Design a protein with these regions (language model features):
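Short active-site neighborhood of thiol/selenol oxidoreductases, capturing the structured segment around
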Residues: 51-73
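Secretory targeting and sorting signals
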Residues: 1-32
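Short loop/turn microsegments at loop-to-beta-strand junctions
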Residues: 38, 60, 133-134
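N-terminal "domain-start" segment that seeds a small globular fold
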Residues: 22-52
Length: 169
């Protein structure tokens, strides 16, 4: 049996290929998979249909709230202001655990001029595993997201603004 040694150039090339395969550098990174949680439909407070998939590829904020929640009431003016100041980010409020009239009164009271959904059966909340309100999901255009849930205090307008600004940075 005869053993044939590789030339230094071939040995170097083989080690580069082996290293690339070992560390996953052999191909361009795959595009991020779409977040299947966005595969939901809902109804706006005005009765129009809404498709969560319409948010894919866009910076977006999902805000989970109820009209009787003291922290949601404390956050609402800031959410309204931050949404108005960031027109390139889509805001969607997702209300649950109350009747439609209470939800509509909340939206009117705080001038929430963005889409708000009536999640009466809690199915969208369940899809995102929201245990209590208020909660947020911050989506970047690449589909990655951050879930924030603090049931013991309201998010400050400054923190919300900083998080929203980071979505488009």
């Amino acid at each position: 049996m005869r053993i044939r040694l590789l030339s230094p150039v071939k040995a170097f090339a083989a080690s580069v290929v082996a290293t690339a395969l070992l560390f996953g550098l052999s191909a361009a990174p795959a595009a991020l998979a779409a977040d299947d949680r966005l595969q939901f439909t809902g109804t706006t407070l005005s009765g129009a249909p809404f498709d969560g998939a319409s948010l894919q590829g866009k910076p977006a904020v999902l805000w989970f709230w109820t009209p009787w929640c003291p922290f949601c009431n404390a956050e609402a003016p800031g959410v309204s202001q931050v949404a108005a100041a960031n027109p390139t980010v889509t805001f969607v409020g997702i209300a649950a655990h109350s009747g439609g009239a209470a939800m509509q009164n909340f939206v009117s009271k705080y001038n929430l001029n963005f889409t708000n959904l009536n999640d009466a059966d809690g199915s969208i909340w369940a899809r995102y595993n929201v245990p209590w309100q208020p909660a947020y999901v911050f989506y970047r255009a690449d589909g990655s997201s951050t879930f924030v849930n603090n049931p013991t205090s309201a998010m400050s307008p400054q923190e919300l603004s900083d998080r929203v600004t980071a979505l488009t940075a």
